[in-house]
Amino acid sequence: MGNIFANLFKGLFGKKEMRILMVGLDAAGKTTILYKLKLGEIVTTIPTIGFNVETVEYKNISFTVWDVGGQDKIRPLWRHYFQNTQGLIFVVDSNDRERVNEAREELMRMLAEDELRDAVLLVFANKQDLPNAMNAAEITDKLGLHSLRHRNWYIQATCATSGDGLYEGLDWLSNQLRNQK
């Protein structure tokens, strides 16, 4: 009998877990975002060859965030991380107008993968502190997000170094997880 109440309590108040894959072109700010969320501070980063993985606790949800390197030579390896991914965070350097089409191509290629069909999409329009950064509406247009008819998605303007927008994005992800059956 006590076990029933323990399971009910855990179901109502227990921690949920969510597997998140964070990808984007190289130098978009993925690793800076990961460690800003994990440690609350800015870390000095070098290009990620392979991946970083950390658990971020937020609002009773344990996010396991896989930050995968974005250099073009290692992007084909992204697919090895797709299995069991519930949320995809795609990080865009909002200041990099020259590569936004490349970012769109990579995003659309990933979203076509069967293993990611049920994953929700959060786009971080990063580096909003830079003077020539595209705003979230412009990034939405350039990435073709409005064409995603059967995908739950959200875009959040962010600045990884200050942390602006990061927790708003996690709020959206946690609400999506809570609303899943």
From Swiss-Prot:
What are the recorded Gene Ontology BP terms?
actin filament organization; dendritic spine organization; Golgi to transport vesicle transport; intracellular copper ion homeostasis; intracellular protein transport; long-term synaptic depression; lysosomal membrane organization; mitotic cleavage furrow ingression
Would you tell me the Gene Ontology cellular component terms? cell leading edge; COPI-coated vesicle; cytoplasm; cytosol; endomembrane system; glutamatergic synapse; Golgi apparatus; Golgi membrane
GO MF annotation terms = GDP binding; GTP binding; GTPase activity; magnesium ion binding; phospholipase D activator activity; protein domain specific binding
Chain positions covered by the region annotation Important for the stable binding to the membranes: 3-16
Pfam families tied to this protein: Arf
* Swiss-Prot/TrEMBL catalytic activity: GTP + H2O = GDP + phosphate + H(+)
Tell me the enzyme class: hydrolase
The entry's protein name is: ADP-ribosylation factor 1
Q: Which gene encodes it?
A: Arf1
